[in-house]
Amino acid sequence: MKRNHTRTKRTVAALALAAATAVGLSACMPPGYYGASGTLDNGDQKSMHVVVFNGWDEDTAASYLWKHVLEEKGYDVQLTNSDVAPAYSGLASGDYDVVFDTWLPNTHKQYMDTYGKQLTDLGSWNEQASLELAVPEYSGIDSIDELKAHASEFGNKIIGIEPAAGETKVVSDQVIPQYGLDGMDFITSSTPAMLADLKASIAKKEDVVVTLWRPHWAYDAFPIKDLKDPKGALGKNEEIHTIAKKSIEDDFPTASKWMSDFSMDSDTLYSLENALVNSGAKTSEYPAITAKWASEHQDYVDSLTSTK
């Protein structure tokens, strides 16, 4: 009996210790953490996988912002960079949960046509988006229809971004043939390379024409202007949408509601883009930079998860 009594006391003590440990751990967990089951107390899965388009700075800004916001709420958020086509394929298959940079109705139409039935559109967060051909303010032309006659002044080159980008297809399939620019070389590589070329040309006060888009921090950083597009080859103004996997509202009922209410004007976006992309910081420094920016824009950040 004594041995059994001792065992009982040890069992009670062990259970008490386990309970105390659980309470102690829960006190240390981020708000919303539920436990090891992989879910939060708001009904959402704990882990979210965000895909980020290579070279799209507004996507980088929005993705790091939401990573910060969600991790403050107890989520684990993984960001993965990808070219556009495999990003949509990954969303359709459920390998990724969400992307914050789908331009509609034009730029990413082909991907929505292909995968739209396997995706969920959580709505637009910026309605001031547009594709542009931009030149330095000192350039002597103001419209794309003047570019052919002045092509030699621009080295017979249009400097583009990633080959798989939606804007690249628009320029190649619409702008170049409509304005008779087939005699110019359309150079594609990456957004950082395009921006480096733009910066170097302006430093030398040389003419250069680049593919660009609004909103983008380059408009604050460089003396540039958009060329008028009288033929409308670049398309009308667009909206930036948050597109997610089909099951997003089942897997993340709370976060998907926050994201469907997400809104960010261009000035606020420029501010975060400048802090991240135009600061010369390493990617590893982006979380800390975003946290600092968030503390300086706390009312806005808090509004992203407020009940509306």
Task: Enumerate the predicted regions with their spans.
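Bacterial signal peptide processing site
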Residues: 29-32
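An extracytoplasmic/periplasmic, membrane-proximal ligand-sensing/linker region
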Residues: 45-48, 58, 174-184, 188-205, ...
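C-terminal motif of bacterial Sec signal peptides marking the signal peptidase cleavage site
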Residues: 21-27
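Short helix-initiation/N-cap motifs at beta->coil->alpha
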Residues: 54-57, 78-90, 186-197
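A conserved helix-loop-strand patch within extracytoplasmic ligand-binding domains
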Residues: 117-164
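Short, well-ordered beta-strand elements
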Residues: 43-58, 75-80, 155-159, 259
